[in-house]
Amino acid sequence: MNAEPKEQDSPAPSAERTEASQEISAAGAQADKPKTEANGDGTANGASANGQKPNPKDPSRPRRKKARRACFACQRAHLTCGDERPCQRCIKRGLQDACHDGVRKKAKYLHDAPDGALMPGIGGTFYNNPMRNSLPLSRNGANAVNATGQQSAGANFYPTPQSTTYVYQENTINQGSFPSQSPVSPTFNLKATPTARTNSLSSVNPQPPSTSVSGPPGQGQNPFAGPFFDPSDPALFNFDLSSMNFENRYGALEFGMLGHMATGAGDSPSDSATQRGSMGRSGSAQYASTPITGAPGFGESPGNQQPFMFGDPLLNEWPSGQAPGQPHLPGVYPQSGQGSAIPGHLSKADAPHAFAIESGPASFNSPGATTSPQMTTGLEETPFHSAVASKSNGLAPHGQRPMITTPSLKHQNLQVGVRRRQRNPSAIYDSVKEPYAYTSRFHGLTAFIQRRFPPQKTLQIAKALASIRPSFIATTKTLNRDDLIFMEKCFQRTLWEYEDFINACGTPTIVCRRTGEIAAVGKEFSILTGWKKDVLLGKEPNLNVNTGGSSMPNSGASSRSFTPRSTVDNTPGRPQPVFLAELLDDDSVVQFYEDFARLAFGDSRGSVMTTCKLLKYKTKEDMEGAAAEDSQRWNNHLRKGGIASEAGMNQLGFKDGKVECAYCWTVKRDVFDIPMLIVMNFLPCI
């Protein structure tokens, strides 16, 4: 017996290696027949009769191809595996029944991805499995589909996630068929009656279904144990992941979801979607048969529509234009319960904790966190007093509550007094008929500067204005009358926007034209300087005699002669706004025009931040009534209690008629790139 093997071992070792490689290939081809063939002497194939194995360092030895993913046993042993299942190593060790793909450590951004979605071997069966997408489920549990043992222990080791598309029907309704248009876009044929809509899937004592998919027959699966819908299922959003160049299905799903959210972001919302205010979809679930009463297709009017979102009946609960008399289908969030004090109201525990994401061009209004299926009226659709009345009564007519959006929350939580009349910007385009007379206003500015300032400072201001005069001429020489009228309309429209900003901002703010005329002023600026808004805008005569001279506070006389302007004296019937140069002292005016010459046609986004001295508004009577003891008394008040309230702000600069401030200003240009207005913000230096 020992002599025969020695004689058989006489051939060259290459013959043994060839025989071993053939045996390995044969075993890989018959992976589904796990058995080990042995020679007559009890020695396994692939090894010689004397127990010697092929030399692993032999260059002629066939190399194994590296597997895409090792099995669980080879992964733990850090050994080379193969693509076949069961692999050769598990077959030799007798572990062929437990040979399955190992699970790799997922990246952080994939930690919430199901393991099945990351397995490359089941790319065509995880999402597009016809068994998974076409299993109907009756509520009485009469139809149950049991998977065989070979299917449960075959290619898919991990059970399919609980995202099977179940269609719940009443016992009195026949089971519908499910023809699929595409593997990722099933067409739902649903037939129901109003009676069926009144039954909630989350009502009393729901019977758990008896259908088990890819699992043991005796182990029931509860569809309510998982989430309401599977966000990792591309069929929910009509994704074609096979067309995306991603090795990882979850990465492709994330990319497709971002594209789905961005789809239609710039489109104008449709009438039905705007009124419905619900989440828009491009349609992965369509009604192909008789529609449910009160729930037509997405393109119909929302007056009798019940949106069917994400192909899940449980998410059939969304604000819609449901009529009060129609039966209501409760859904995810119960409307009333044992803990609810008011029927029909969401309890605190049941309310959602986040705003819904608008995934399509359905509406530009933010869905509210307190929205419910019965909230069918938005703030934009009802008068303001009706929303307040609904809040005070607790219940709206027909037991409905108005849909609370972000603007309505702002209005209802704040104590709103008399409502301001809504301004219409269209009136600007109707009222402006003539171009603004910038030439005459520049002449008025020049006359004022010559009348107030000494020759030296007048020359400095003139040089600054002369440096930008060629630019003004070059930009305006091609403009005709229509262009100048359009320029004034642009100015008034921009000023219309700034007025709301000034009223909402607590900083002393003024807006001037490029000539320096005051065009808009905030309340805080009037409190700080004493200049009334009507005086600054030219609606009342300007009786100020404070020019910032050295003899001003005590004597009441100016350092030079100055005749106060009034709208009647100069140009009868025409408003004469105050120039910015009348609000600043001499040095501040010179500094302003030097900075304006650099910024007017320079950096369009530039700004200037520096200090200045604002002149208080004082008439001749104010100057005569001012006494030194009053000034001393006010200074003592500052040392004791400081500045408080509007009266304290108004008394700043009482001593010398000047308020030292830090201010920041910038230049805004029009469509012709010409300086249009100057926006200035002041903060007093206390």
Curated annotation (Swiss-Prot):
Record feature DNA-binding region, as residue ranges: 71-99
Compositional bias ranges of the Polar residues kind: 177-222, 269-292, 362-378, 403-415, 544-570
Transmembrane segments: none
A GO molecular function held by the record: DNA-binding transcription factor activity, RNA polymerase II-specific
Keyword Transcription: yes
Keyword DNA-binding applies: yes
Cellular location(s): Nucleus
GO cellular component, one term: nucleus
Top-level taxon of the source organism: Eukaryota
Keywords carried by this UniProt record: Activator, DNA-binding, Gluconeogenesis, Metal-binding, Nucleus, Transcription, Transcription regulation, Zinc
Region ranges (Disordered): 1-64, 177-224, 265-378, 390-422, 544-572
UniProt xrefs under Gene3D superfamilies: Zn(2)-C6 fungal-type DNA-binding domain
GO biological process, one term: gluconeogenesis
Summary of the function given for this chain in its UniProt record: Transcription factor which regulates nonfermentable carbon utilization. Activator of gluconeogenetic genes.
Family, as annotated: Belongs to the ERT1/acuK family.
Protein name in UniProt: Transcription activator of gluconeogenesis acuK
Protein species of origin: Aspergillus niger (strain ATCC MYA-4892 / CBS 513.88 / FGSC A1513)
Gene: acuK
